[in-house]
Amino acid sequence: MEVERDQHISPPSLMAKTIPIIDLSNLDEELVAHAVVKGSEEWGIFHVVNHGIPMDLIQRLKDVGTQFFELPETEKKAVAKQDGSKDFEGYTTNLKYVKGEVWTENLFHRIWPPTCINFDYWPKNPPQYREVIEEYTKETKKLSERILGYLSEGLGLPSEALIQGLGGESTEYVMRINNYPPDPKPDLTLGVPEHTDIIGITIIITNEVPGLQIFKDDHWLDVHYIPSSITVNIGDQIMAEQWKVQECVA
């Protein structure tokens, strides 16, 4: 869902606040669950450290993404979204000067469950792409379910409640790799429009390049890069479930 954006300058009192950083290695799981719920309710986004996904795998994920976008346009278009398709899968690009448009290219495809995967949209180059994505899928699925478990417990629900509510083993996981190349005419194009994620949760692998922002207390705040961390964004589906639980408790 998109919302109207107004670039207010954040006051010092708000700029001093930072997005929560949650250490998943903490042995006090009740404390972790509380932190996940608090971060979700107050911010809708948080960083996790000691998350269990190997850093070398994250680097390989970044590498295959970079290598794909460096391919000639003809090779990238081999996995392009089909003209007229109502589905989202495939390579898309908008690297042209149209005022108000986003300067970006993306690769979007399903990674879970296996019955939903269409390998026609998985690049054959770089050659290690499939191996890396399949390995990352296993790890990100475990992390997602772990976070959903903490969130369920923190809301006073059985640990499997949100996982099952989102579909259990049938829940669709989607990979989106974004590339925002330097724009020589930034006044003619925009970044990604303001929006909320309609899904359950988004696991975001970031890098040193700034740009990600959140809207809090009527101001836009930068989401700073934290080395070795993963950023978790809570989507509309989970937010709706949180409100339902709170209303029932009230």
Curated annotation (Swiss-Prot):
Alphabetized UniProt keyword annotations: Iron, Metal-binding
Signal peptide range in chain numbering: none
Residue ranges of every copy of the Fe2OG dioxygenase domain listed in the record: 171-250
InterPro entries xrefs: DIOX_N (IPR026992), IPNS-like_FE2OG_OXY (IPR044861), IPNS-like_sf (IPR027443), Oxoglu/Fe-dep_dioxygenase_dom (IPR005123), Plant_2OG-oxidoreductases (IPR050295)
SUPFAM superfamilies: Clavaminate synthase-like
Domain of life per record: Eukaryota
Keyword Ligase (UniProt): no
Keyword Hydrolase: no
One MF term in the entry's GO annotations: flavonol synthase activity
A single BP term in Gene Ontology: flavonoid biosynthetic process
Binding site residues for Fe cation: H195, D197
Pfam families xref list: 2OG-FeII_Oxy, DIOX_N
Family membership: Belongs to the iron/ascorbate-dependent oxidoreductase family.
This protein's name: Putative inactive flavonol synthase 2
Gene (name only): FLS2
